[in-house]
Amino acid sequence: MIFNARKTEGLEGFTKVTGDLTFDQVDINIGDGFDGSSGIFKAPLSGIYRMSFSGQSAAYIIDYTQIMVYKNGYPIFFITDGNEAEKADGNNVSYTWIMRLVKGDELKLYSDNYLYAYSNEPLTFSGELIHIEN
């Protein structure tokens, strides 16, 4: 099981995003666990997974970027980055984590502030099963 998805649309410029992150391009989806239109990953097998998010905070904004990772409808942790100066470039934001999922568990990403993406610098969400459990 492995997936990689990219969000290249809808965040051009200085965009405040509040809501579930969806992904317009799914490059690989072996195991059919990821749905780009909803942004939800549903574990096809129980096991240990390596998950990753990367993106960029919006430029020229003195604020922060915060991505919440939800498991089965409950927030389990936050990915946060502060942009403390009006910079022409946003900050790169990335995080990789390892977690145990049971078959059917659902993960999604939620944003409550500024993000930036376009075709050359997409937001990405990916995951892979690294150990199967019975």
PLM region spans:
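Extracellular jelly-roll beta-sandwich "head" domains, especially the C-terminal globular C1q domain
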Residues: M1-N134
